[in-house]
C-alpha cells in the first residue's frame, strides 16, 4: 500500500543561500541516487506567516512501508540526516497510508 512521507524542517537560524541550495540539491538527487520513491517534492513556504518556524517541506510517496524503511536506511538519506544534524535541524515527520480512508480527492 502506498505510503506518503511528509517532513517539515526547522533550523535555529536561517540557512544561507548556499545551504538552502545544497539542501535542495541533495533532495533532488534522491530519485536517481535512492530510487525507491514514486513522488518527490521539496519546497519552501510562500510567505513564512504560518510555518511556526518550519520553512522547508519534503513530500514523498513510496509504494510500501518496506520501501520507506529502505529509504530511511539508505546511505544517501543517512548523509542528508547528518547534514541536517550538523545544522541543529528539528524535523517534524508524518507517514500515512494512501487509501480509501485518507484519499479524499483523487488525482
Listing of model-derived features with the role each one plays in the protein:
Residues 1-56, 63-73, 89, 96-107:
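Short S/T/G/P-rich N-terminal loop/turn motif that feeds into the first structured element of a domain
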Amino acid at each position: 500500500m502506498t505510503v506518503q512521507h511528509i517532513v517539515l524542517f526547522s533550523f535555529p537560524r536561517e540557512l544561507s543561500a548556499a545551504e538552502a541550495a545544497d539542501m535542495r540539491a541533495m533532495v533532488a538527487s534522491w530519485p536517481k541516487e535512492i530510487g525507491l520513491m514514486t513522488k518527490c517534492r521539496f519546497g519552501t513556504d510562500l510567505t513564512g506567516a504560518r510555518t511556526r518556524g518550519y520553512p522547508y517541506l519534503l513530500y514523498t510517496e513510496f509504494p510500501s512501508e518496506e520501501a520507506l524503511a529502505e529509504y530511511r536506511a539508505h546511505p544517501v538519506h543517512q548523509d542528508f540526516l547528518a547534514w541536517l544534524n550538523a545544522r541543529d535541524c528539528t524535523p517534524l515527520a508524518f507517514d500515512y497510508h494512501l487509501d480509501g480512508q485518507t484519499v479524499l480527492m483523487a488525482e
